Design a protein with these regions (language model features):
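Hydrophobic residues in well-ordered beta-strands that form the structural core
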Residues: 22, 110-112, 188
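A generic structural signal for short
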Residues: 24, 53-54, 89, 107-108, ...
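Short glycine/serine/threonine/alanine-rich loop segments
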Residues: 45, 74, 106, 161, ...
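Residue-level marker of regulatory loop/turn positions in helix-turn-helix DNA-binding domains and
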Residues: 93, 111, 144
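Internal catalytic-core helix/loop-beta-alpha segment
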Residues: 101-109
Length: 224
């Protein structure tokens, strides 16, 4: 049986990258390279300048894509297809996580700033292809990414989620602020990353965990 503070929950919302698999896999390293290559081709610059542009867009717009769309009119599908064309050999299924998600009662969703095609490739690699009731990606957000509040409202509206009866699990602490403000229970996966811990305000974090598989196993009654 779930702990008392979680027994009313009927919707579980999970971030994808660095949340459903360990951050040490560092898939973003591969995606980062592809982003740089895309920007180099787009603006005709070297790798150093492309990295500066990319990080500036991420800082100022929430995602590199948002910056590219606003500044260059980039086709989001073209960009996402390009940058997510990576080898997923760095990640593998976690049997404890797979089993714990299967035991978890309520609806389960993936909420990602990535796109559907990439997310489904990752979930398949993790043995979680059939573990979720819905996937809310950057296309469904109309390219307004987390942590913009509109992204969370769109998620709840699309899937008829009551924030007061939901949990959000996320490695980027700042992405939990809007969730908490909507009334969700928030779970921060603290992976030791300086970037992920940015804006880690305890007022917006209900649970701080190190490993999602271990935590879910514990709350679903199998912490062996």
């Amino acid at each position: 049986m779930l702990p008392a503070p979680l027994r009313h929950v009927d919707a579980w919302i999970f971030d994808l990258d660095n949340s459903l698999y360990p951050a040490k896999a560092n898939l973003f390293e591969l995606i980062d390279v592809r982003m740089g290559q895309f920007i180099q081709q787009l603006v005709g610059c070297d790798a150093e300048e492309a990295r500066r542009v990319q990080k500036g867009y991420f800082r100022d717009h929430g995602t590199t894509l948002a910056g590219l769309m606003k500044t260059h009119g980039t086709d989001p599908r073209e960009f996402l297809d390009f940058v997510h064309d990576i080898d997923l050999a760095r990640i593998a299924a976690d049997p404890k996580l797979v089993a714990a998600l299967d035991r978890l009662s309520g609806r389960k969703f993936v909420f990602t700033n990535g796109d559907d095609a990439y997310a489904r490739r990752v979930l398949d690699r993790l043995g979680l292809a059939n573990a979720f009731d819905g996937l809310h990606d950057i296309h469904a957000m109309n390219y307004v990414p987390k942590p913009h509040p509109d992204a969370y409202r769109a998620l709840c509206d699309r899937w008829a989620i009551d924030p007061a009866r939901s949990v959000m699990v996320e490695d980027m602490a700042r992405n939990l602020h809007p969730a908490k403000q909507l009334g969700m229970i928030t779970v921060w996966i603290d992976n030791g990353s300086e970037q992920a811990s940015h804006e880690a305000d305890p007022a917006f974090i209900d649970y701080r965990i190190a490993d999602i598989g271990e935590w879910l196993a514990e709350i679903t009654g199998d912490a062996t």
